[in-house]
């Protein structure tokens, strides 16, 4: 059985949001990100590990947020070290509106909160969710930048999957702000 977070991470081929401002960049190396739903959710805290560098961090930073594949719109606003990110993405033709808030030093630790709304009901919607990241040091042997290790020990090569997706005919990374977007 696939856990809700694992399912969300499996479908996540997150694109760095386009916009006037950029996502914060975390210190390169190994990050542990603890994710836990707010309230009375049945989803317990889960932890993933991410190996980052400057070229993969924007993808991995948003990788804990469900439904960030095939994004058509995004906005990033930064104010006094706090980031407010909004995306409109599609998963199997189901519109996903995400709101993400981030804050922290991004060199040793950060925290955030996300909430996603689906146009059509889905089986596992975690509801409002908090996450905290902390830098652990250098990536472990065998890990490459862009790798994410799930709670069950499975390693996803997020950056590699993104590259494969970009290589497909007709794919646009939406750097045009979604001007050529369509469901």
Language-model features and meaning:
Residues 34-70, 153-156, 160:
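Short, solvent-exposed loop/hinge segments that bridge or flank secondary-structure elements
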Residues 48-50, 72-75, 97-104, 114-118, ...:
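Hydrophobic/aromatic beta-strand elements that line small-molecule binding cavities or substrate pockets
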Residues 33-36, 84-91, 112-120:
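Short beta-strand segments that buttress and anchor functional surface loops
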Residues 19-29:
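N-terminal helix-cap/turn-to-beta initiation motif at the start of protein domains
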Residues 150, 156-183:
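Intrinsically disordered, low-complexity terminal/linker regions enriched in Pro/Ser/Gly
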Residues 38-42, 91-96, 118-125, 139:
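Short, cysteine-centered beta-strand-loop-beta hairpins and adjacent loop/turn segments enriched
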Residues 4-16:
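Bacterial N-terminal signal peptides
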Residues 61-105:
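Mid-chain, structured segments of secreted extracytoplasmic proteins
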């Amino acid at each position: 059985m696939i856990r809700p977070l694992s399912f969300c991470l499996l479908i996540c081929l997150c694109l760095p949001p386009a916009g006037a401002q950029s996502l914060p960049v975390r210190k390169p190396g190994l990050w542990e990100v603890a994710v836990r739903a707010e309230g009375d959710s049945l989803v317990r805290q889960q932890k993933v590990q991410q190996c980052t560098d400057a070229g993969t961090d924007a993808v991995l930073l948003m990788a804990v947020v469900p439904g960030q594949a095939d994004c058509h719109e995004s906005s990033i606003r930064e104010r006094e070290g706090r980031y407010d990110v909004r995306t409109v993405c599609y998963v199997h033709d189901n519109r996903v509106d995400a709101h993400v808030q981030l804050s922290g030093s991004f060199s040793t630790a950060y925290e955030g909160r996300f909430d996603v709304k689906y146009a059509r009901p889905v089986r596992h919607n975690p509801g409002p969710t908090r996450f905290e990241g902390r830098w652990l040091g250098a990536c472990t042997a065998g890990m490459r930048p862009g790798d994410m290790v799930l709670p069950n020990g499975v390693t996803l090569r997020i950056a590699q999957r993104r590259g494969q997706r970009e290589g497909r005919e007709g794919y646009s990374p939406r750097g045009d702000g979604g001007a050529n977007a369509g469901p």
